[in-house]
Amino acid sequence: MKIGLIGGLLLVPAGIYGQTKMESPNVVIIEADDLGFGDLSCYGATAIQTSGMDRLANEGLRFTDAYCTAATSTPSRYSLLTGMYPWSNPQAKILPGNAALIIDTHRITLPKMMRSAGYVTGAVGKWHLGLGDGAVDWNQPIYPGAKEVGYDYSFIQAATNDRVPCIFIENGKGVGLSADDPLYVNYRMNFPGEPTGKDNPELLRMHPSVGHGGSIVNGVPRIGFQKGGKAAQWRDEDMAELFLEKAKHFLQENQNRPFFLYYGLHQPHVPRVPNERFIGKSGMGPRGDVILEGAGPAESYG
């Protein structure tokens, strides 16, 4: 089986995963993070050729007169998954990484609707809707979370690339965490003895921008503070391909039944650390490189 790939995007042509009924087409929603209308060559960009995303545009429909209820992380995702205006929920604002889940688990959501229609549902990538009840122990199963929102499977990051905790969460459990080195997160103060981007610039491989003076993970300064969980920390360069592999596995595993996948790209949100094979490829610096990583030339993975 061949799976089409657009940089870090999935191509899912009709029938490639065996749609069993025309009335139940497979559905994949891809939501990029901080990608502008003018960043794509199918909408007129010339500096970077986003041929992968262009293929989706050319083989489908383009919304040239469309509107969104919000254009930032948490509010846009809240609105997409609940059908609610984000201003109807005071908590639907850009959240810290340790925020509580802001979606009422008793409310109908898009994945719940899909599941009730016979779909298996999955979420891969950026989450940023809060987790738990606001007092999360990251070393224990996290409840409520993506499952309670309506996803049968999830492999997510809690918030954004630049916010702690810098770990992956699969089906409500921190990936790679050990009782010998538990993870702690705080958004008010640092943990004693832990280096930060503000106080230890010599440990950084990029200059900290405003607000990014917190914990250092993978040589990158973050928002907020975390301690421990060293073996579970992500390497920014590997995030795109790992999310892709998890998404592909979900589609392959469920190819004989209708599926719904929410695929939250983490690109091109800061800190913009592309995989080594994309560094310098765009000629437009790190932001251009991660756009190319996420929406650039189509490749094929067997």
Descriptions of predicted regions:
Residues G4-L5, L10, I16-G302:
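Formylglycine-dependent sulfatase
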